[in-house]
């Protein structure tokens, strides 16, 4: 009864406000104490709804004017319901731009992607389904473009559950965002649901799907899509064909790529420079510079080679150790009006550094500076690595400092090069500092990084420094996790210091860290190859009890690390198999290797 009286009172207030607005006496609305909170969200929503019915006053203009005016009051703020109602009214009267802008503001302020919120918005109004679908489609686009893929999918699922159909553009944007994030499995799931809802795919949707095939390296699926397109009367365009050609070229399937080009030309679609660049990139990547150059010369008169064409060829010649031809092509590139960018310079710089031509590399850097071409991470990492290889750590550190001063951030490759360089010159304190900095920045050192440090300590007969390294991790508040112990133990075992590896292993277990298959198998093999079969068997027992298995990756890694131990390895793996610590599929792999 109380709720009914309250609803009746709100309805009377809403009618009174509507009458006041229609008479143009806006100041009298304040008598209803709008700004004091007496005018509830439900009343505002009702007023907006009723005012929209007076089409003689210009469609939604009265509703919109009231919405804006109410929003301008000092203590007034529109609720989610009143804002949503206004968006639907604007959409109904095809004021799409204003509705879209209001929806964007609402999406920034409210958690619209919550299923509970979405259900309340749909359930709270009896609107034209097409209007609701329109607004939800905009919301899908908003979240997808903002990189909030999961939110966009939630809205899509809400549209489905309401029996509505999303707009084609919204589906295209969502699919495209999923492809960019490499979520190809989700792409196909959304596409199937979209088709079931009655959304008819056009050339743009199919191009997104072909692009998804490109991302996942699946030319067979792309070919099926082309067949499906032709069956449905959707004709492939230049983007479709170029994407498929690119997939084949990346997989070195050049005959198939040429077949696609032939089909493309027979269907009346002329190749463009992107088509040629795909072929040139494919051949250059494989070092087939003769074919790449032939294609370059065959570029038709109505197609012009671009910056990418020349850069791809220059990179190809650098990879094939023909720096002179790469430099000649750079001159041709400049004479044709194309300015080499940082990618072009990086290719040449990499080759000069590989050849130890550091002076020429520095001259190239000076040239880049003169042309206002800013070095990127690849430029700096190439130089740091080159200096570290020739043990010029002073110059490597200078490049590092310039890199930081220019606003670039050190990445995993920068740190690894510096750590390796400092370990080579036995400046292990500096190597440790780079290691700690690397971890603090969120990068995970791998086996190679820890190996360099272990080798450095052993070369200086400072085995105890490894234990101190673990202690320093704790002092700095860093996590001495299983990955750290794994890297150290693996390298120490490789150096045939299995007794010290055992010390680290016991230290790890005392801290509550549980060893994995890599640690146990590595130590077991270290014992095995030194004739300590009993100790190895004890580790196998623990592995069996903990259900730790040798996988294919571990099998290949240990076999590669100890490639010279053929007979020892064969007996070791046979024993591992007898202990049921290796799967049948890996045993078959071992047998095939032995046959070969």
Swiss-Prot record:
Family per record: Belongs to the PPR family. P subfamily.
Organism annotation: Arabidopsis thaliana
Source domain of life: Eukaryota
Disulfide bonds: none
Ranges: PPR repeats: 132-166, 167-201, 202-236, 237-271, 272-302, 306-340, 341-375, 376-410, 411-445, 446-480, 481-515, 516-550
Protein name, as recorded: Pentatricopeptide repeat-containing protein At5g38730
InterPro entries, alphabetized: Mito_RNA_Proc_CCM1, Pentatricopeptide_rpt, TPR-like_helical_dom_sf
Family annotation (Pfam families): PPR, PPR_1, PPR_2, PPR_3
Coiled coil regions in record: none
Xref: NCBIfam families: PPR
Keyword entries, A-Z: Repeat
Stored PROSITE patterns: PPR
């Amino acid at each position: 009864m109380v709720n009914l009286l309250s609803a009746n009172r709100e309805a009377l207030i809403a009618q009174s406000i509507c009458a006041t607005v229609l008479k143009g006496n806006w100041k009298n609305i304040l008598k209803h104490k709008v700004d004091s909170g007496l005018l509830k969200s439900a009343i505002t929503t009702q007023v907006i709804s009723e005012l929209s019915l007076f089409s003689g006053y210009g469609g939604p203009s009265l509703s919109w004017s009231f919405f804006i005016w109410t929003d301008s009051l000092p203590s007034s703020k529109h609720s989610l319901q009143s804002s949503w109602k206004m968006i639907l009214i604007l959409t109904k009267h095809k004021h799409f731009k204003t509705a879209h802008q209001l929806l964007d503001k609402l999406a920034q302020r409210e958690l619209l992607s919550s299923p509970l919120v979405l259900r309340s918005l749909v359930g709270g109004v009896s609107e034209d389904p097409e209007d609701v679908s329109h607004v939800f489609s905009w919301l899908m686009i908003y979240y997808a473009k903002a990189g909030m893929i999961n939110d966009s999918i939630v809205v899509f699922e809400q549209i489905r559950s309401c029996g509505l159909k999303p707009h084609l553009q919204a589906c295209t944007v969502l699919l495209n965002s999923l492809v960019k994030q490499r979520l190809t499995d989700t792409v196909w799931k959304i596409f199937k649901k979209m088709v079931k809802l009655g959304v008819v795919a056009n050339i743009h949707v199919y191009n997104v799907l072909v692009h998804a095939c490109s991302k996942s390296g699946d030319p067979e699926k792309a070919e099926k899509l082309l067949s499906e397109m032709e069956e449905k009367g959707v004709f492939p365009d230049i983007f479709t064909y170029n994407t498929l050609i690119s997939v084949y070229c990346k997989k070195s399937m050049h005959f198939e790529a040429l077949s696609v080009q032939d089909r493309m030309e027979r269907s009346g679609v002329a190749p463009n420079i992107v088509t040629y660049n795909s072929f040139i990139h494919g051949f250059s990547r494989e070092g087939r510079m003769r074919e790449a150059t032939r294609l370059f010369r065959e570029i038709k008169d109505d197609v012009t080679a671009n910056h990418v064409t020349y850069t791809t060829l220059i990179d190809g010649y650098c990879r094939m150790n023909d720096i002179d031809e790469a430099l000649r092509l750079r001159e041709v590139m400049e004479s044709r009006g194309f300015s080499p960018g940082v990618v072009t310079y990086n290719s040449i710089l990499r080759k000069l550094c590989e050849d130890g031509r550091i002076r020429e590399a520095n001259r190239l850097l000076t040239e880049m500076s003169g042309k206002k071409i800013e070095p990127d991470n690849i430029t700096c990492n190439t130089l740091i690595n080159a200096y570290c290889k020739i043990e010029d750590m002073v110059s490597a550190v200078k490049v590092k400092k310039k890199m930081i001063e220019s606003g670039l951030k050190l990445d995993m490759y920068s740190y690894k090069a510096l750590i390796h360089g400092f370990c080579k010159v036995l400046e292990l304190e500096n190597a440790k500092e780079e290691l700690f900095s690397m971890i603090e920045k969120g990068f995970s050192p791998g086996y190679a990084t820890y190996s360099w440090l272990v080798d450095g300590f052993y070369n200086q007969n400072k085995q105890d420094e490894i234990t101190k390294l673990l202690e320093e991790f704790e002092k700095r508040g860093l996590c001495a996790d299983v990955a750290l112990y794994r890297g150290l133990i693996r390298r120490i075992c490789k150096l045939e210091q299995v007794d010290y590896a055992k010390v680290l292993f016991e230290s790890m277990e005392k801290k509550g860290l549980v060893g994995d298959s890599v640690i146990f198998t590595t130590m077991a093999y270290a014992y095995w190859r030194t004739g300590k079969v009993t100790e190895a068997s004890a580790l196998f027992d623990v592995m069996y009890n903990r259900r730790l298995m040798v996988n294919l990756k571990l099998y290949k890694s240990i076999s590669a690390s100890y490639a010279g131990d053929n007979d020892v390895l064969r007996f070791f793996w046979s024993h591992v198999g007898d202990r049921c610590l290796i799967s049948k599929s890996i045993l078959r792999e071992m047998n095939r290797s032995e046959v070969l």
